[in-house]
Structure formats: structure tokens, C-alpha cells
Amino acid sequence: MAHSITFSPDAWADYLYWQSEDKKTLKRINKLLQELQRDGAVQGIGKAELLRKIKGMSKRIDDTNRLVYTVENDSIVVLSCRGPYED
């Protein structure tokens, strides 16, 4: 089942940052987003981790950056894609 993906305003700003600063990281984020859309919130690459305080999940982009998201109905809402999560 394909899930729709939306970005919070902060997450969109993060995404635009990667577009201009680091194409390798952007490519990794795009791969994570494609897998989230195709396979859902838990499966795929990036080591999904349940976050307690924000009732969301994160996947590892690289050693310091995380893709943080929540699932609402059939939609995945990206909360951030730059920096560590704040759990």
C-alpha cells in the first residue's frame, strides 16, 4: 500500500537545505522516503526507532542526522530531516 508523504514546514526547510548543500544526503533521504511510502513506517533501511515524547519514529540518514516522522491514518508526516531527533 502506498502511503502519502507530507512535510511539516520545518522538515521542508531541512529538505531544501539538503538540496543545496549535500546531494549525497539528499539521495539517502529520498531513498528513505521512497521506502516509507512503499513499505510503511517500520520496514526498510535506516533502522526505525520508536520515539517516546513525540509519538513518532526516526530512521537514520547518517551518523548525525535522522529522518523523524509520524504516521497519521495512511499519511506519513515528516517532522525533520536534519540533525538528531529530540526525544
Role assignments for model-derived ranges:
Residues A2-I5, P9-K31, I45, S58-R66, ...:
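Enriched for short, Lys/Arg-rich terminal
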Residues Q34-I61:
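A short, surface-exposed loop/turn module that caps and links secondary-structure elements
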